[in-house]
Curated annotation (Swiss-Prot):
Phenotypic consequence of gene deletion: Conditional knockout in tachyzoites severely impairs lytic parasite growth in host cells without affecting intracellular replication. Loss of egress from host cells; however, tachyzoite motility and host cell invasion are normal. Guanylate cyclase GC is unstable and, together with UGO, remains trapped along the secretory pathway. Loss of microneme secretion in response to phosphatidic acid or a decrease in vacuolar pH.
Source species of the chain: Toxoplasma gondii (strain ATCC 50853 / GT1)
Cytoplasmic face residues: 1-181, 495-524
Quaternary structure, from the entry: Interacts with GC; the interaction regulates guanylate cyclase GC trafficking and sensing environmental changes.
Segments on the Extracellular side according to the record's topology features: 203-473
Superkingdom, taxonomy of origin: Eukaryota
Family: Belongs to the CDC50/LEM3 family.
Protein name per Swiss-Prot or TrEMBL: CDC50-related protein CDC50.1
One GO cellular component term noted in the UniProt record for this chain: endoplasmic reticulum
Region spans: Disordered: 1-40, 52-86
């Protein structure tokens, strides 16, 4: 391989202070060269020491640093490297096996020694040397070039990792936290968490909810039932006569209804909801068993398909000022406007690319294959006296979902709210907003069409006065307050510990407090 030999070396930055030292080989005619291959460890590169004839013709051992070499007459130069290797013992064992390479260097000031392998012994500077010597190249007895395999002892990966960690720990700088610094940090943390937790709990008091439960059954499938119920301060989380704020949010709450069930969650086709029309039932097989419907003795593809879309929430809410006194039909009450626009229901949510209605001309071209059950126009047969079942259902949806204000068909705000599956069995869907402040009591006119009695479900109307944070903050406030109290206890413990040491005439300097022995006596 040539006249140069390399060996991997890693040292610390302190080793750069060694300049030059003369090296005398023990034999007058060393082999041509020694090649040592060192693999990089942990992604680091290796430095090398090369053996080459010196400028003066002697057998010097110049050092090579990251590709740049400096040759001096019978001298050496040493530099630091950045890769990891094995321990000192393994390299010394290999040196003893090749005496022709062993040289003795002159001591530098009586503190450091340098030998022919490039090993520097420093009492304060730890070194890591590469550990692989796969081959040796030199001249045999006949004078021909010869290469010999050199046995190498590989250390376990875990042992090398631990060795490197020890080397890093021995030369790293670690902060030693004093008791005063930790005490101040804990005190600041306690003040922060206690104050923020108290503020969150106070804000939660400004969050008021008034909940009206109703779960009346409908008379029969597809029919409606009308209710008029009052909402007073007795239905609220705390005693209030007025719900404050610029707007009061109205939510429809469902109980014991699991939208995240696999049979419901995956029963949908997102491409169809985005405006794609499918005429082949095989294209919407994920919606089964609600992928097709028989309309006029013809099997058609449902648009939109799926169990969740077919079971859209259809109860309707209206609000009136005051409460009824006597017969509902004879007591006039002023209605309260309920905002159900898409801007309110779908505030700051990019729904336009996910929910689209197909163009009217595209729907008209495939009416014989696709059943657009949410469209009153596509189900109108042109006869005013008798309406088909499909036409009646579409017109009922148009009224219950408020197509005029909340959008039509798939782009309806109530429908999009319903299609966002909830993670728990009890959930709320935003229904609209009322202008605030709202004086209590108020009346809720409910058109009941969604029957939940078959699975023992629950329904409720919830009026919400939001806090400045927008929702409930009781849990996070309690969590902050608890952690702040824990830090406060730690502060008092450190103060007591510091006071105890001072009474005993000792000085506490760091956190490594030692347990007092039983025989220790307190100083007076």
């Amino acid at each position: 391989m040539g006249e140069n030999s390399t060996t991997g070396l890693r040292g610390q930055a302190d080793v750069s202070q060694f300049s030059d030292a003369a090296v005398e080989p023990t034999l007058s005619s060393p082999p041509t060269g020694q090649r040592q291959q060192s693999l990089p460890l942990f992604g680091e590169e290796t430095c090398s020491i090369s053996s080459a004839p010196s400028v003066g013709g002697g057998g010097g051992w110049p050092f090579q640093r990251q590709g740049s070499s400096r040759l001096t007459s019978r001298g050496t130069s040493l530099s630091s490297c950045s890769d990891a290797g094995s321990g000192l013992g393994a390299l010394r064992q290999r040196e003893d096996s090749f005496p022709e390479y062993h040289g003795v260097g002159l001591p530098l000031g009586g503190k450091y020694a340098l030998d022919g392998t490039g090993l520097v012994l420093a009492p304060r500077v730890p070194f890591i040397f590469s550990h692989q010597l796969p081959s040796l190249t030199g001249l045999d007895e006949a004078g021909f070039s010869d290469t010999r395999k050199v046995p190498s002892t590989y250390q376990a990966l875990a042992a090398r990792f631990v060795h490197q960690v020890h080397q890093e720990a021995g030369n790293g700088m670690y902060p030693l936290w004093s008791a005063g610094v930790v005490l101040r940090l804990c005190l600041l943390g306690a003040l922060f968490f206690v104050s923020v937790g108290a503020w969150l709990i106070f804000e939660d008091e400004q969050h008021v909810e008034c909940k009206l439960n109703y779960a009346e059954k409908t008379l029969q499938e597809g029919s409606s039932r009308y209710l008029l119920k009052g909402i007073s301060s007795a239905h609220c989380t705390r005693e209030v006569n007025e719900l404050k704020g610029e707007e009061i949010s109205v939510y429809a709450e469902m109980g014991h209804f699991f939208q995240n069930d696999a049979q419901v969650l995956w029963s949908r086709n997102d491409r169809q909801l985005a405006g794609k029309i499918f005429t082949d039932p095989k294209d919407v097989r994920e919606c089964e068993p609600l992928a097709t419907a028989v309309v006029g003795n013809v099997t058609k593809v449902l648009h939109p398909c799926g169990a969740l879309a077919w079971a859209v929430f259809t109860d309707k809410y209206q609000f009136l000022e005051g409460t009824p006194e006597g017969d509902n039909d004879q007591v006039p009450m002023k209605p309260i406007p309920l905002n159900q626009t898409q801007a309110v229901l779908l505030h700051s949510w990019p729904w336009q690319d996910m929910y689209k209605n197909p163009p009217a001309e595209d729907r008209a071209a495939v009416l014989d294959k696709v059943y657009f059950w949410m469209s009153p126009v596509d189900n109108d047969d042109g006869e005013d006296m008798y309406k088909t079942r499909e036409e009646a259902r579409a017109e009922l949806l148009m009224d219950r979902l408020n197509y005029e204000e909340a959008g039509e068909m798939v782009e309806n705000g109530h429908f999009i709210q319903w299609m966002q599956t909830a993670a728990l069995g009890t959930f709320r869907k935003l229904y609209g907003s009322l202008e605030g402040p709202l004086k209590l009591p108020v009346s809720a006119h409910i058109t009941v069409m969604y029957d939940v009695s078959s699975w023992k479900g629950k329904k409720a109307i919830v009026l919400v006065q939001k806090s400045r944070l927008g929702g409930r903050s009781l849990f996070i406030g309690i969590a902050y307050l608890s952690f702040g109290c824990l830090l406060t206890m730690l502060v008092f413990y450190m103060l007591w510990k510091k006071w105890q040491y001072r009474r005993e005439g000792e000085e506490i300097r760091d956190l490594r407090w030692q347990t007092k022995t039983r025989g220790s006596k307190k100083t007076k």
